[in-house]
Amino acid sequence: CGTNRAWCRNAKDHCCCGYSCVKPIWASKPEDDGYCWKKFGGC
């Protein structure tokens, strides 16, 4: 699964537990890649 800065296609891509798929500001299209980033809180 993806940890910090692992690429993810969208929110459905599998980021590790405790991580979420975040898109940069310039990634406006749905097909644009985002990256997994650690969320606050436990898992």
Swiss-Prot record:
Keywords: Disulfide bond, Knottin, Neurotoxin, Secreted, Toxin
Disulphide bonds in the chain: 1-16, 8-21, 15-36, 17-43
The protein's name in its UniProt record: U5-hexatoxin-Mr1a
MF term (GO), any: toxin activity
Entry domain remark: The presence of a 'disulfide through disulfide knot' structurally defines this protein as a knottin.
Chief location: secreted
Post-translational modification: Contains 4 disulfide bonds.
Sequence similarity: Belongs to the neurotoxin 35 family.
Function: This toxin blocks the neuromuscular transmission, and also acts on muscle. It exerts an effect of first exciting and then inhibiting the contraction of muscle. This toxin is active only against mammals.
Subcellular location as annotated: Secreted
A GO term from the CC aspect: extracellular region
Tissue distribution of the protein: Expressed by the venom gland.
